[in-house]
Every structure is written in structure tokens, then in C-alpha cells.
Regions:
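Short, solvent-exposed loop/beta-turn-alpha elements that line the ligand-binding surface or hinge
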Residues: 58-65, 218-221, 291-299
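Stable alpha-helical elements in mature extracytoplasmic
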Residues: 44, 53, 74, 78, ...
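Short, low-complexity disordered leader/linker segments with a strong preference
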Residues: 1-34, 338-344
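Secondary-structure end/capping motifs
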Residues: 238-318
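Pocket-lining segment of extracytoplasmic ligand-binding domains
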Residues: 105, 128, 167-171, 175, ...
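Short, glycine-/small- and polar/acidic-enriched structural segments
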Residues: 30-176, 192-198, 213-214
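Conserved C-terminal helix/tail region of periplasmic/extracytoplasmic solute-binding proteins
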Residues: 309-344
Length: 344
């Protein structure tokens, strides 16, 4: 199996930090025989983890294609790597995808499919008083990197309840820090709450006695929203249509496989952490984390558009409006380009 992992990860309490080291950042690599894929070492990214580990993707793209994996802990970092042409396809949340699409004027990114729905929660300290909106003044609440999906959701939730962060003249301290740092500060009692994805949400509950105030999907229509999307770099997609087509087919096959083999999928995820990170998560954390999300290839388009509306209301999308036309890959509209490429 032609798979290489371009990362070294250390684990503190469970996962302490991620150091990203690219095997190659060259945009001059021959792209016909390699696909560089980015994802996170987290439950919501079960599709690439399980599908690569059990060989579905390798069989789908063929043995002549090398799959090079790169692990990240931040969506905005993934998008910057897309811009640097060091990644070809990636699994990432809607917030960074939207920002990246607009930053590139719609030229660099296409959404191919969904990968997960749900899987984020608002976790609070048991004595924080955050179970009542009246008690938010002066509280310290964390989310991962600014403008990522959880950050947008947290800030929109505050705005929906007539609250503002300190930097906007409000009364709530919003801290944008990495998931491992959120874990550390929560353990020390230095933050009152955190809006985080799985498995971090369940780790805060099971290991640090946090209280899950609610799962984010409870705030969405039909209790579903796109939390992880499969995207491709547009020029890679145009230059390698058959490879991307096979990747997408394998992606959908993996979604079906995971939903039909839940226990084995959890076992594969646990083995992945042990093999690539040196330590896994307790089985009970993996079980609960998986139960808090849905693995799906549906991008839930309306939720992506709603994310954009919310990000725009927070001032994340600039002052001149935004246009997401073309963000979703439509194979029929790209048929001519594909035929041209396949015919040489």
C-alpha cells in the first residue's frame, strides 16, 4: 500500500500537540501519480482515516497512485496549504472552506461531498453557571482557531442571545486556541466553557467532568449540519478528473462501509491513533464520540450556505458581500474539461 504519513504527533493528556511536516511542498510534482490528502486525527474525519487504513481508497484509485497523507489540527491551516499547492484533496469544516473559496475569488476550491454531520458540542464547567444565558457576562469561552466552524457557531450563538465578545464591546471573553490547549485550560479551570468538535468534547466530559450543555445539531433545522466536507483544489481536479472521480467514489463507498461496520470502524480508528500517534483514546470516549455525529457523503448544502450567512453577520467575509456560486462541484458542468483531459 503506497501510503505515507507526513506528520509527527505528540500526546499529552490524550493528544497534546500536532507538528505538521510536509513530505513535499513542491507544486512541481507530477500530479498524475500522487494524491496528497489532508485531514485531522479526529472522529469527524473517520472517512479518510478508515478508508485509507482499510484500503478502500487505494483500491479505488489504483496501485499506481501514491496516497500521501498530511494531518492537521486547524481548518485555516489546511486552506493555506491548498493555496500553497501542497495539498490536492482535503477534509475540513465549512467555515474555512467558505473563507478559502472567497479569498481565492472562487478559483481554488470545490466542495466534492460531505463527510460528517454534527459532532460539535458546547461543554461547560459544572460550576460555571453557563447553563443560564444570564450568567455569560465575564465568562471565558474557548473555540479553536478564529473563523473555523466552531468559532463561527459560538460567536453566532452569542449574537443570537444578544451577547458580544469583549473585542466587540461586549462582556464575554472568547479565546481562540488549539484543541489541546483548550483541554489544558479546561483542566486547570482557566476557561468556563468550550465549543469543540469530537473527540475533544467527549474528552472534556469524561476526563475533566465537563457538562455537555448541548450538541450543536440541536440548534440546526432537522438537527443536521455539515461539519466536515471533502474538498479538492480546483486545478488538481481539472488536471486529474479520473483520479478525483475515483477518490469521490471511494469516499462514498467508505461512508457506506463505516455505517455498516460501526464496531470495526471504531477499531480501525483506535489502531490509527496507536500507529501514527503512539497512543489511542479510551474505548468509551471513541464510542461516545462516534455516537455524537453522523458519517454522510451529503454536503447538506443549505447548512453550508447558512454557515456563510452567519460568518458574514460576524464580519468574517468582508464588507462588500459575498458570492458562493460555483463552490459545489457539479460534474455535468465540468464534463467538457474532463473529456478534454482524458483525451489528452
Amino acid at each position: 500500500m503506497k501510503i505515507s504519513v507526513a506528520i509527527t504527533l505528540g500526546i499529552g493528556a490524550v493528544i497534546a500537540f500536532a507538528i505538521i511536516t510536509s513530505l513535499s511542498n513542491s507544486s512541481d510534482q507530477a500530479n498524475q501519480d500522487i494524491v496528497r490528502v489532508a485531514f485531522f486525527p479526529s472522529i469527524g474525519h473517520a472517512v479518510p482515516i478508515v478508508g485509507i487504513e482499510n484500503g478502500i481508497f487505494q483500491r479505488g484509485v489504483g496501485d499506481q497512485i501514491k496516497i500521501e497523507t498530511k494531518l492537521f489540527d486547524s481548518g485555516p491551516q489546511v486552506i493555506e496549504s491548498i493555496f500553497a499547492r501542497s495539498i490536492d484533496v482535503a477534509y475540513v469544516g465549512p467555515g474555512p472552506v467558505i473563507n478559502g473559496f472567497l479569498k481565492s475569488h472562487g478559483n481554488d476550491i470545490k466542495i466534492l461531498a460531505g463527510a460528517a454531520s454534527g459532532g460539535a458540542s458546547f461543554i461547560i464547567q459544572p460550576d460555571s453557571g453557563l447553563d443560564s444565558i444570564e450568567n455569560f457576562d465575564g465568562k471565558r469561552i474557548a473555540s479553536p482557531q478564529i473563523s473555523n466552524s466552531q468559532d463561527v457557531s459560538l460567536r453566532y450563538y452569542l449574537a443570537s442571545n444578544d451577547l458580544k465578545p469583549i473585542e466587540k464591546g461586549g462582556t464575554v471573553f472568547v479565546l481562540n486556541i488549539s484543541n489541546p490547549d483548550i483541554y489544558t485550560l479546561f483542566a486547570k479551570g482557566e476557561i468556563d466553557g468550550a465549543w469543540v468538535p469530537e473527540p475533544w468534547a467527549t474528552m472534556l466530559v469524561q476526563e475533566l467532568d465537563g457538562v455537555r450543555l448541548f450538541n450543536e445539531e440541536k440548534l440546526w433545522p432537522n438537527e443536521e449540519f455539515a461539519s466536515v466536507l471533502l474538498i479538492a483544489r480546483t486545478d488538481y481536479l481539472e488536471n486529474n478528473p479520473e483520479l478525483v472521480k475515483n477518490w469521490l467514489k471511494s469516499h462514498k463507498e467508505t461512508v457506506v462501509w463505516i455505517n455498516s461496520n460501526a464496531d470495526e470502524s471504531k477499531s480501525i480508528f483506535e489502531s490509527f491513533l496507536k500507529k501514527h500517534m503512539g497512543k489511542s483514546l479510551p474505548t468509551k470516549i471513541i464510542d461516545e464520540s462516534f455516537s455524537n455525529l453522523t458519517i454522510t457523503s451529503d454536503p447538506i448544502k443549505n447548512s453550508v450556505l447558512t454557515f456563510a450567512e452567519r460568518a458574514d453577520s460576524l464580519g468574517y467575509l468582508g464588507r462588500s458581500g459575498y458570492n458562493l456560486d460555483g463552490i459545489f462541484y457539479q460534474p455535468d458542468l465540468n464534463l467538457n474539461a474532463m473529456v478534454k483531459q482524458l483525451n489528452g
